């Protein structure tokens, strides 16, 4: 998956991210800046999931939006 593409299109993808993770605030999504590790951290923080689970969710999101 291409995180450079996601980062470059992050403003357009913020709605997708908020749709997938409704607990993320606008600030959370903005602060993630389309970077995988930042988004993983935000998902972990808001949902209280382990890092590997947050990574799995973020990778699934990336695969879906990179089509």
Locations of regions flagged by a protein language model:
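Intrinsically disordered, low-complexity, hydrophilic segments
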Residues: 1-67
